[in-house]
Regions:
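A generic, lipid-embedded transmembrane alpha helix
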Residues: 48-74
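Membrane-embedded alpha-helical segments of multi-pass membrane proteins
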Residues: 17-21, 88, 92-99, 165-169
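First transmembrane helix
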Residues: 5-40, 173
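Short aromatic-rich membrane-water interface segments that cap or initiate transmembrane helices
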Residues: 5-7, 80-95
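Elongated scaffolding segments in large macromolecular assemblies
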Residues: 136-173
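Internal transmembrane alpha-helix with an interfacial aromatic "cap," most often the third helix
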Residues: 24-34, 64-73, 90-133, 141-149
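Perimembrane loop-to-helix junctions flanking transmembrane segments
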Residues: 38-41, 75-85
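Membrane-interfacial loop-to-transmembrane alpha-helix junctions, especially the N-terminal start
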Residues: 40-57, 121-137
């Protein structure tokens, strides 16, 4: 530990501790859900299966990224090891971010189905209920290409496009 980074170790330790708790909670929920169904393959509700998988991916990648912190644009890494490679972490982030978007989109579609309204005369409201979750996922999916290329090329503009796509996706919902 150098004097330049001494301030960051408490922050890093807190982030790792929070993510350890997240992983424990995630695995507990996953285990209880699969055990009560008699195994993962016995879960008949596809919504529950997909949400479990996406939640597990998002939580595990989040924990990995909390341990191996990096800054893509400047290729800064917390540790000088291959596991802290910006490109490797970006690759994992693709799955985590798509899982995150999928969790939101899938939950919104389920709520829209379960809480169906009888008022379909308003086209804007009908669009928000039925199509915006797909557009959210599409925006986040498209953003992944810009983020990955920006990580390789170290291009600020591509990172800005990625963030803009995230913003557009969430403004749509």
């Amino acid at each position: 530990m150098t004097p330049d980074t001494a301030w960051a170790w408490p922050w890093w330790s807190a982030m790792v501790a929070v993510n350890i708790i997240n992983v424990i909670v995630c695995l507990t929920i996953f285990r209880r859900t699969t055990r009560s169904a008699g195994g993962f393959s016995n879960i008949t509700d596809q919504y529950q299966k997909h949400m479990l998988i996406m939640g597990l991916i998002f939580t595990m990648v989040g924990a990995y990224r909390a341990v191996f912190v990096s800054r893509y644009l400047y290729q800064f890494a917390w540790f000088d090891v291959l596991a802290n490679s910006s490109l490797l972490i970006r690759f994992f982030a693709i799955f985590a971010e798509l899982s995150f978007a999928g969790l939101f989109a899938y939950a919104m579609l389920r709520f829209s189905k379960d809480l169906a309204s009888n008022n379909h005369t308003n086209p804007a409201l009908n669009f928000i209920e039925s199509r915006s979750p797909y557009l959210l996922f599409f925006c986040i999916f498209t953003a992944q290409f810009f983020a990955t290329i920006a990580t390789i090329n170290k291009n600020n503009t591509l990172f800005a496009i990625e963030e803009t796509l995230w913003t557009v996706g969430f403004l749509l919902i």
